[in-house]
């Protein structure tokens, strides 16, 4: 499923993501825009691992896809569940990622497109 920007923002807000570990709702929406363009089915292969779903969660550290050597699976989930339309496990795993010392900087797309930028446009016009 490709989520509408505002629909996605509303789901995140309901799930307690606004301000979670100091990350504003607009930053989360910016991150997902640039990682997956709000597409739950997004898959991107890297050398030795793969990124899955709307937040592009990586199989080396966070989920198990059964084909990544020495995978940690810190979110204790199958990567497959990150590709369905239900965002609850994606959100729980994203929360787990930002609890690490690196926080939201774990996402390259956030560092490239959202860090130190005016991200208010990502939730502008959304009824939140």
From Swiss-Prot:
The protein's UniProt keywords, in alphabetical order, are: Antimicrobial, Bacteriolytic enzyme, Digestion, Disulfide bond, Glycosidase, Hydrolase, Secreted
Molecular function per GO: lysozyme activity
A Pfam family: Lys
CDD domains noted in UniProt: LYZ_C (cd16897)
Does the keyword field hold Nucleus? no
Pinpoint the C-type lysozyme domain residues: 1-128
Q: What class of enzyme is it?
A: hydrolase
The UniProt record lists the EC number as: 3.2.1.17
Per the record, its GO cellular-component terms are:
extracellular region
Reaction catalyzed = Hydrolysis of (1->4)-beta-linkages between N-acetylmuramic acid and N-acetyl-D-glucosamine residues in a peptidoglycan and between N-acetyl-D-glucosamine residues in chitodextrins
| GO BP terms in the entry | defense response to Gram-negative bacterium; defense response to Gram-positive bacterium; digestion; killing of cells of another organism
Q: Which cysteines are joined by disulfide bonds?
A: 6-126, 30-114, 63-79, 75-93
Described function? Lysozymes have primarily a bacteriolytic function; those in tissues and body fluids are associated with the monocyte-macrophage system and enhance the activity of immunoagents.
Q: What else is known?
A: Lysozyme C is capable of both hydrolysis and transglycosylation; it also shows a slight esterase activity. It acts rapidly on both peptide-substituted and unsubstituted peptidoglycan, and slowly on chitin oligosaccharides.
According to its UniProt record, which protein family does this protein belong to?
Answer: Belongs to the glycosyl hydrolase 22 family.
Q: What is this protein called?
A: Lysozyme C-1
Originating species:
Sus scrofa
């Amino acid at each position: 499923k490709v989520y509408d920007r505002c629909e996605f923002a509303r789901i995140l807000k309901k799930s307690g993501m606004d301000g979670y570990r100091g990350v504003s709702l607009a930053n989360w929406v910016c991150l997902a825009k640039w990682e997956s363009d709000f597409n739950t089915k997004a898959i991107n292969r890297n050398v030795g691992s793969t990124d899955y779903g709307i937040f592009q969660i990586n199989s080396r550290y966070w989920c198990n896809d059964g084909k990544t050597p020495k995978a940690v699976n810190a979110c204790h989930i199958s990567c497959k569940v990150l590709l369905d339309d239900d965002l609850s496990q994606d959100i729980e795993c994203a929360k787990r990622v930002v609890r690490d010392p690196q926080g939201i900087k774990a996402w390259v797309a956030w560092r490239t497109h959202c860090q130190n930028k005016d991200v208010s446009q990502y939730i502008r016009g959304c009824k939140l």
